[in-house]
C-alpha cells in the first residue's frame, strides 16, 4: 500500500508541473514545503490562487473539510482553490463562483467545480495578468 504522504506529494508535483507547462510559466511552480509543518499554508500559490491538492483512492465528492482547509489558508490573501482527484476519475478544481464572474457576491461558500483543463482555460482567459506577473517575478 502506497504511503499517503508520498502519494499526496507526488500529486502536488504533478499539478505544479502541469500548471507550469499549460500556462507557459518561465519557472516551474514549487511546492510550499513548510505546509507539512505549519497549519494554514496551501500546497502551492500561483498569483492570487491558493491551491490545495488532494489525491484519494475512493470517492466522488471532496470532503467539506478539504474546502475549509484551503479557505482558511487563503483567508484575506487570495482565492481558495481545491484541486482533487479520485482513482479512475478526472482531476477537478473547486473554486468560488465569484472568481468566474466578478458581478457575483464574494462568498467562498458558493462554489463550482471545473475540470482541470477548464481551470487552466479560466486562468488564461480571465487572469492572464497572473501569468505575466509570475513570469516577470521569476525572471
Question: Predicted segment positions?
Answer:
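Catalytic phosphate/metal-binding cores of nucleic-acid and nucleotide-processing enzymes, i.e., regions
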Residues: 1-139
Amino acid at each position: 500500500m502506497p504511503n499517503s504522504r508520498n502519494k499526496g506529494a507526488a500529486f502536488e508535483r504533478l499539478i505544479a508541473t502541469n500548471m507550469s507547462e499549460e500556462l507557459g510559466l518561465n519557472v516551474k511552480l514549487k511546492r510550499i514545503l513548510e505546509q507539512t509543518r505549519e497549519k494554514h499554508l496551501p500546497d502551492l500559490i500561483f498569483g492570487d490562487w491558493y491551491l490545495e491538492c488532494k489525491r484519494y483512492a475512493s470517492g466522488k465528492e471532496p470532503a467539506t473539510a478539504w474546502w475549509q482547509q484551503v479557505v482558511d489558508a487563503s483567508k484575506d490573501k487570495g482565492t481558495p482553490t481545491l484541486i482533487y482527484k479520485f482513482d479512475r476519475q478526472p482531476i477537478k478544481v473547486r473554486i468560488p463562483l465569484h472568481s468566474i464572474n466578478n458581478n457575483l457576491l464574494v462568498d467562498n461558500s458558493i462554489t463550482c467545480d471545473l475540470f482541470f483543463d477548464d481551470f487552466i482555460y479560466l486562468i488564461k482567459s480571465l487572469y492572464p495578468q497572473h501569468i505575466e506577473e509570475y513570469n516577470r517575478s521569476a525572471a
